[in-house]
């Protein structure tokens, strides 16, 4: 890794969740990500701070945006990137997560990016391996890089985060994105609201500093930012809503519901989008939508995270760069 003096204070060697970061940590990562945007669009051999580093992506859950984003982020930084094909791996033959991690650790990677259906999987690996761990989503627990890219998208669109009213709508119960965003947005000074049917709200959400509403009309009043969440039917074992049609009418984002928010509000969605379920196509593709911008910001954010973690590890180990 080449000399990098951009991170004077970033004490973390893993990114397991937003809960582990303070406001200064968030600002450092967002500032670096913002600086990375010009370099996130193509490989620049003159800007290769991760040259000679190895990044392994270990996705136990299907992913398009997040896995591709991490692959591109590593390559933009000059890292050697390997994505493990879980479908053909020893995991399918009964190998445990710990055994897989131990095997990969023997290969001496510098970064291990993991997505897993079990909450705490990334934290468990961090105790077992010698490299930097990045949580790319663990069950319904956290998705820290998604929260960071959402914050960067908001800040670039609105010029600030502090003082904004951000409304998170939809399947909050099953959403790791919601949890990470609540933590980051509260820390950065936003006013956070949640709108969902009571069956899709986690217990104790109000204790996280969130204003809770059960109607879009009330919840979207004065909204600067609307963040729609996918209805995660694959995680549902019971009937949480009467019907898709009724859910879209009352809790989907269509013209009538959007009219309750500020006229200049922006719309976010972590993807994948279920058109006609949580958001109408004309809204998802409309001028207020920042969905494609979020994807673009994701590469810059993940570049910043990898740089920061490796820089911190090298400083802690006393290695000469």
From Swiss-Prot:
Gene3D superfamilies, alphabetized: Aspartate/ornithine carbamoyltransferase
Highest taxon, organism lineage: Bacteria
InterPro entries named among the record's database cross-references: Asp/Orn_carbamoyltranf_P-bd, Asp/Orn_carbamoylTrfase, Asp/Orn_carbamoylTrfase_sf, Asp_carbamoyltransf, Asp_carbamoyltransf_Asp/Orn-bd
EC number from the UniProt entry: 2.1.3.2
Broadest EC class assigned to this enzyme: transferase
Residue numbers binding L-aspartate: 93, 176, 230
Keyword Protein biosynthesis: no
Pathway annotation from the record: Pyrimidine metabolism; UMP biosynthesis via de novo pathway; (S)-dihydroorotate from bicarbonate: step 2/3
GO terms classed as biological process: 'de novo' pyrimidine nucleobase biosynthetic process; 'de novo' UMP biosynthetic process; amino acid metabolic process
GO CC field: cytosol
Single GO term (MF): aspartate carbamoyltransferase activity
The reaction(s) this protein catalyses: carbamoyl phosphate + L-aspartate = N-carbamoyl-L-aspartate + phosphate + H(+)
Residues bound to carbamoyl phosphate: 65-66, 115, 143, 146, 271-272
A Pfam family recorded for this sequence: OTCace_N
Keywords for this protein: Pyrimidine biosynthesis, Transferase
Job of this protein: Catalyzes the condensation of carbamoyl phosphate and aspartate to form carbamoyl aspartate and inorganic phosphate, the committed step in the de novo pyrimidine nucleotide biosynthesis pathway.
Similarity comment text for this entry: Belongs to the aspartate/ornithine carbamoyltransferase superfamily. ATCase family.
Annotated PANTHER family: ASPARTATE CARBAMOYLTRANSFERASE, ORNITHINE CARBAMOYLTRANSFERASE, MITOCHONDRIAL
Subunit structure: Heterododecamer (2C3:3R2) of six catalytic PyrB chains organized as two trimers (C3), and six regulatory PyrI chains organized as three dimers (R2).
HAMAP family reported in the protein's UniProt record: Asp_carb_tr
Name listed for the protein in its UniProt record: Aspartate carbamoyltransferase catalytic subunit
Organism name: Bartonella quintana (strain Toulouse)
């Amino acid at each position: 890794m080449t000399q990098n003096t951009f991170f004077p204070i970033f004490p973390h060697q893993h990114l397991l969740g937003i809960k582990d970061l303070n406001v200064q940590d968030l600002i450092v990562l967002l500032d670096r990500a913002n600086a990375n945007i010009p370099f996130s669009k193509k490989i620049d051999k003159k800007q290769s701070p991760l040259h000679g580093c190895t990044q392994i992506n270990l996705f136990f859950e299907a992913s398009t945006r997040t896995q591709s984003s991490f692959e591109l982020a590593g390559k933009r930084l000059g890292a050697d990137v390997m994505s493990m094909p879980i479908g053909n791996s020893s995991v399918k033959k009964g190998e445990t997560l710990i055994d897989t991690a131990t095997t990969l650790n023997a290969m001496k990677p510098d970064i291990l990016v993991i997505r897993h259906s079990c909450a705490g999987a990334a934290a468990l690996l961090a105790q077992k391996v010698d490299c930097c761990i990045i949580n790319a989503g663990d069950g319904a627990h956290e998705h820290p890089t998604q929260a960071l890219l959402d914050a960067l998208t908001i800040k670039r669109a609105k010029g600030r985060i502090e003082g904004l009213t951000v409304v998170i709508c939809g399947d909050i119960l099953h959403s790791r994105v919601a949890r990470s965003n609540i933590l980051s947005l509260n820390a950065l000074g936003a006013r956070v609201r949640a709108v969902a049917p009571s069956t899709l709200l986690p217990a104790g959400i109000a204790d996280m500093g969130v204003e809770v509403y059960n109607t879009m009309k009330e919840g979207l009043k004065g909204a600067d930012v609307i963040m729609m969440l996918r209805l995660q039917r694959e995680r549902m074992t019971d009937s949480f809503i009467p019907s898709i049609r009724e859910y879209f009418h009352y809790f989907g984002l269509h013209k009538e519901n959007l009219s309750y928010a500020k006229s200049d509000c922006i719309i976010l969605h972590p993807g994948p989008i279920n058109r006609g379920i949580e958001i109408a196509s004309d809204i998802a593709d409309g001028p207020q939508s920042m969905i494609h911008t979020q994807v673009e910001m994701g590469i810059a954010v993940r570049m910043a995270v990898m740089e920061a973690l490796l820089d911190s590890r090298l400083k802690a180990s006393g290695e000469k760069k």
